[in-house]
Amino acid sequence: MKVVIAIDSLKGSLSSIEAGMAIREGVLRAKPDARIVVKPLADGGEGTTDALIEGMNGERIDLTVTGPMHTPVKAHYGYLKDSNTAVMEMASAAGITLVPDDAKDPLLATSYGVGEMINHALQKGCRNFIIGIGGSATNDGGIGMLKALGVRFLDENDVDAGEGGQALAKVSRIDISGLNPLLREAHIQVACDVNNPLCGEIGSTYVYGPQKGVTENQKKQLDEDMAHFAQITSQALGTDYCNTPGAGAAGGLGFAFLSYLGATLTPGIELILNAVGLKQELSDADVVVTGEGRLDFQTAMGKAPVGVAKLAKKHHAKVIAFAGSVTKEAAACNKEGIDAFFPILRNVCTLAEAMDSATAKANMTATAEQVFRLL
């Protein structure tokens, strides 16, 4: 029996690999002769970098970059030496969690630190990039990131247009001659799970701006400024990605990646499953095990475990899911490729007790053992 395990992290409790290894132990207790493969799982959002570092023998690279409010912040990315790949989350450098609620300012917030991370990885030898762009604090169209990478944005007086959302309206000329030449050799894949265009009522400013501090009175003007920036970009580069699905992700960072860096935008789970080589392992799997901290209706809507399940079903494998907790609505997962799911709790306890890593590991192992005794 070949068993492939790819379970998302149980946040605050077990990492993806820790959960996978706990399941592995339980499977071996029940099926000592089983062939078991454990792969990291993430959806391109928070935790993706750490999951791939741990699961693919990567190296964590720590660095200090310019934060969203122009002060130094500690960021990190993953370095996968074998494939010269950098795995990073823009939120590490320009995330909304780095800005206190009372300090959010879309006119000032910059993505400059994201460009600094990319530069650092390029200098280290990385030529392949997997970049998650969820959880941004910015609405700058990617101007900050691009400036760090060498692009010049000039106003009508040929003076630097500045940074943040306030720079969008000032840009009248773009000079890409200083763009980091190493980018010509780079292949950038962006994990993007939103389909919003750059501008308009379903664009970046109207939909995601409010959580970044955009007021009702600012929406229209900032959206018009973003459209102006897109028009100047189109004139300078001869491209038009304004209405491309995902262009509005991360305050227009999706647009910047498409227009200036030749990146591809891919659903996060699809990108990660390809990166960890899960498809190859599933080709001859008998049973696939997945799961996450909480299995609910959102899981069925396409989160990482369902992504694994759908891929597994193409190879006719049985799919089992384990979770820290399971809601009634999780039954919808049975229609999305998960044959059976199981909560791992074995007794009544507090949330803190359930999330204790040693307890969660023991519960995961014990549940996996009992389930695999049936197989």
Roles of regions detected by a PLM:
Residues 2-133, 137-375:
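N-terminal loops that bind phosphate or other acidic moieties
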